[in-house]
Design a protein with these regions (language model features):
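C-terminal alpha-helical cap/extension of soluble enzyme domains
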Residues: 180-262, 266-269
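Active-site mouth loops of central-metabolism enzymes
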Residues: 2-10, 59-75, 96, 128-138
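Active-site-adjacent beta->alpha loops and helix N-cap segments on the catalytic face
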Residues: 13, 32-51, 71, 97-115, ...
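Alpha-helix-loop-beta-strand connector modules within alpha/beta enzyme cores
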Residues: 36-62, 104-129, 167-190, 232-255
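Glycine/small-residue-rich loop that forms an oxyanion/phosphate-binding "nest" at active or ligand-binding sites
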Residues: 47, 53-107
Length: 269
């Protein structure tokens, strides 16, 4: 597959929209409005059954930073095993030390739990380092830590608020990663900027949610009793827009002939 389009979803409705739009794979989480947390087993199993797409499940026990205590780390290892047993094709996680380095010692048992569960099931599992990478101290040291951990993917914006702003670092990361470690470009990715991002970075994998805000089906609405984030309406729901994903997939597909032409010219030389 010359290019990969991964869509981040937190509901079955969003997963189905991503599938209809042409997503190659899904990252599944809960609570995308706060950056995502670990999804339930029921949601994972439902999404797998309804879409048939490869699904990588997020491991994040809470909102906030990526420096976890021993109870949270134990939860993450247990969740890794259970999610893979329930059908997850991969796990997506990250842990940092207080000093801002990738916490290899903390991550090893989490990835080991996922791999052991996959081995018992007789299938492979993909392991991704998520955007904890974007707030680490040294991105190239973090890349080498990911390589040492045997990871397949790093999800990153190039340590910037959005991928277009991080394009220069993303290009360097793609070059440093080589063919065996996928740099998955995420944050601020749109159908409109995908071709330019691909050209500027050399990346082959892109991540977006493609979300829209839907109005709740509730007709009775008691205002002034917040149940979640202050300032965020209880009646505004995030959901992936199949049309956005379709345009993103089309943008990537349009690059394939250009890539093939470049490869043919290179071979002829």
């Amino acid at each position: 597959m010359p290019y990969t389009l991964e869509v981040c979803v937190d509901s079955t409705a969003s997963a189905l929209a991503a599938m209809r739009g042409g997503a190659h794979r899904l990252e599944l989480c809960a609570d995308l409005v706060i950056g995502g947390t670990t999804p339930s087993l029921a949601l994972l199993q439902q999404v797998k059954a309804e879409t048939g797409l490869p699904v990588r499940a997020l491991l994040r026990p809470r909102f906030g930073d990526f420096c976890y205590d021993r109870w949270e780390l134990a939860q993450m290892a247990q969740s890794a095993a259970r999610l893979v047993e329930a059908g997850a094709d991969g796990i997506v996680t990250g842990v940092l030390t207080p000093e801002g380095d990738v916490d290899v010692e903390a991550l090893q048992p989490i990835y080991a739990a996922a791999r052991a569960a996959a081995q018992r099931a007789g299938r492979p599992v993909a392991c991704t380092l998520h955007r904890a990478f974007d707030v680490c101290r040294d991105p190239f040291a973090a890349l080498e830590a990911a390589r040492a951990l045997g990871l397949s993917t790093i999800l990153t914006s190039g340590q910037a608020p959005s991928a277009p702003e991080g394009a220069a670092l993303l290009k360097r990361l793609v070059e440093a990663a080589g063919p065996e470690l996928e740099i998955l470009v995420g944050a601020g990715v749109t159908p409109e900027n995908l071709p330019a991002l691909a050209a500027a970075t050399g990346a082959r994998a892109f991540h977006l949610s493609g979300k829209r805000v839907l109005d709740s089906r509730m007709t009775f609405r008691r205002e002034g009793v917040p149940m979640g984030l202050p300032g965020f309406s209880e009646f505004a729901l995030w959901q992936t827009d199949a049309g956005v994903i379709r345009r993103a997939r089309s943008a990537l597909d349009s690059l394939v002939p250009l890539l093939s032409s470049w490869q043919n010219n290179f071979i002829r030389r």
